[in-house]
Amino acid sequence: MPTYLTEGVILRRVDYGEADRVLTVLTREHGKIGVIARGVRKAGSRLAAHTDLFARSRMQLARGRGELDVLTQAEMVGLTAPLADARRAACAAVCAELADRVLESHHPDPETFDLVVDALRDCTDAARDPRAALVWLTRRMIDRLGYAPQLYDCASCATPLPETSAWFTAIAGGLLCDGCATSDAGVVECSVRVIKVLRVAAAGNAGLYRR
């Protein structure tokens, strides 16, 4: 079978058979792919660590006959979430699931790959709040899907919003002024701080967002 090299991060894994694992891997060059890692659940397997959730590795893969390529070699690059920290593990898991659900298979998108890797890295960084990483990734993914919410003008009447709290509604697609919020039963109040976080995330400046 022909082989190829790629860098990937594990989004999902499922035990298969007596000793194998089926992996969902997000790669920079090939997008989201399915991989089978044979024998990795056996004691002493060289590749076991490379099949951990959120692990990032340089992989050598053999083209499979079906939908799954075969993991043959791997070299760890980084990103293994500290699962002992429940909050960090939970945020990393949601980031991985978001990427898995949103991204189509075999559609390379290096920018989205970097977004996911950065979010997972922040989830493992003791100096970062993992919830902020999750909000950042969610906001950026929404933008890339074309569903960016209106954050500066009222999504209903288009009136510029003052620097005060406002009301968010998914139905209208953004923030509402006080006058329009009364007519929407599904609104959620957002504080000034939350609105600022959303606006910084929308600007796409990761360095500013992490401050």
Locate the predicted segments by residue:
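Non-catalytic alpha-helical scaffolds and adjoining flexible linkers that form interface surfaces
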Residues: 1-211
